[in-house]
Amino acid sequence: MAELKENTVQHTLCMPLCGRMIAARKCPDLFPDRDAERIVRELGEDISGKAMYRLQYMWMNCLIRQYNLAWEITEYLKRHPKATVVELGAGLSCLRRQMSNETNSRYCLDMENVIALREKHIPLGEHEQNIVCDLNDFSWFDKISFDPAKGIVFTAGGLFYYFETE
């Protein structure tokens, strides 16, 4: 039985995850991802041929977003090698593992039910911390430890769709 309910905000976590899985299957040298397929299977998602490929172009767009975020973080870290990395709405992102980055402090912020999934399916890195929060309540910023002289970089992939405009 699937761990995520169909047609829910939480189920949208599968979009970038499935994109990463498809890319790792088709082009493992270009898009290495040792986590995506394992997590999809653990979540109990249907990855049969028809279910998997009917939305593959949408998933590929999510994949491209993920790798663009990795590229931007990498470029920032070249200029600020000791910077803190913060993923707002981290979902089931495995950017740290994809980037093979175990040296920078990293914070993954998301809702309680999502952080519970992260903690079940994605092992924490040595300098990584999951933070349960409501991103509309900026008190989460107090939970992030960083040195302004070293820098900080934020990502927010696929997140803004869920915010309401005022």
Language model: regions and residue ranges:
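A short SAM/SAH-binding and catalytic strip from SAM-dependent methyltransferases
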Residues: 150-166
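A short, conserved alpha-helix within the catalytic core of class I
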Residues: 130, 138-141, 162-166
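Short amphipathic alpha-helix with an adjacent loop that forms part of the alpha/beta core around
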Residues: 139-149
